[in-house]
């Protein structure tokens, strides 16, 4: 079965409708910071902007050339963080080499971190009582898809391929909270095919086009393909197309994780706007 994004997105949109009020609506303002550009990032930003137009969300895109100074980006991030009308900000990653992202993140307020970028947001995945920031949107999108389609997580063996702080590690933390048994694999993992074949669920987030062929899977598995590659051959994921008809469940590319990720970001923005409204005593 194809685990399509549309019904998951519709469920998130319904959730958003219960969050939105006349009081918090005025705080629905999003900032996007981009340094340099790529086809992937431009497409991602374009999708977010479409959603902003759809829901009448204010937005600003702060674009900088690759040779921008670290001081300039840090100053822009600090100004955004201090702007009380902004409830959400996305730092497009990765930054070009030469820019110290960790240094820039010091100026980024956790309260508007709707994509789980700063360390405090990641800590909150380990310590929910901290209640600061949000999970990285792509990692949360994977969980939302699995839950929407009633794929059992409690006790399931989930293999995550890729250990980035954007997807791999945070999705492993989220799965652990669901009582799944998680195996986190990377480029140094030995006997990867044996490991992936033994899983109930495989989450592919390695960033290599069509890398995972049918040889990596078993017929009764659920596969979440996070990869997104756009070139002259069209759009592909990390999982080869031949796997679609081989496994039990799989997310399509396109029309899978990416669309849900955008919906999750908007959901985080709604929640952040509501928190801002409450803090100002306007709820």
Residue ranges and their predicted role:
Residues 2, 90-153:
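Anion-binding alpha/beta catalytic cores of soluble intermediary-metabolism enzymes, centered on
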Residues 27-37:
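Short beta-strand segments enriched in small/hydrophobic residues
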Residues 52-67, 182-184:
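Short beta-strand elements in bilobed, periplasmic/extracellular small-molecule ligand-binding domains
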Residues 94, 206-208, 227-228:
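Short glycine-/small-residue-rich Rossmann-like dinucleotide-binding loops
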